[in-house]
């Protein structure tokens, strides 16, 4: 079977310098939302099984919690696009961030299976809404001529943060504990929500 050769699409327009694009409020808002959504999800998902075992739960129970978490991460994708189309990118992204913060608050309520599993499920859905919404917001930051380099910068920021979060989660869990992690994440979410609220107000005015 022979596949047709890919056709090159003409890119019209002059691309702005990447530094100029990265300094725009639109890019800062979208990148911050994506970095915090994905970074906190990776951090907590990595730390949660260790915390569960440390609290006396079995490895099997920790694994089941991660399975529910992964299902919550990708299950909503069947309708996330429709929600974004109906309510808007910013609102769904903000909802995802609120759910991530709520997952941390639920984790602070106890060390039982219901708190761990419920927190992981909330975290998964929050990541879905937050990251997909932030990715959709990013598309408004660039022209076709700028798309490749802007997406590359955003991916570098997001997945660089994910790598650091994944490698550092165990050490931080050992240093401050499960409760300390879930308390410490809250200001990050608040900062991004404040950026988004400021940008939304600026657009309306």
Question: Where do the PLM segments sit?
Answer:
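Intracellular juxtamembrane helix-capping segments at the cytosolic ends
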Residues: 129-143
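A late C-terminal transmembrane helix in Major Facilitator Superfamily
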Residues: 141, 145-178
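Helix-to-loop junctions at the C-terminal end of transmembrane segments
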Residues: 75-89, 173
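Paired small-residue
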Residues: 103, 114-122
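Structural signature of the two symmetry-related core transmembrane helices
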Residues: 91-106, 186
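Pair of pore-lining "gating" transmembrane helices in MFS-fold secondary transporters
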Residues: 23-41, 121
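Short amphipathic helix-loop junctions that connect adjacent transmembrane helices
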Residues: 46-65
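Juxtamembrane intracellular "pre-TM" segments in multi-pass secondary transporters
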Residues: 2-31
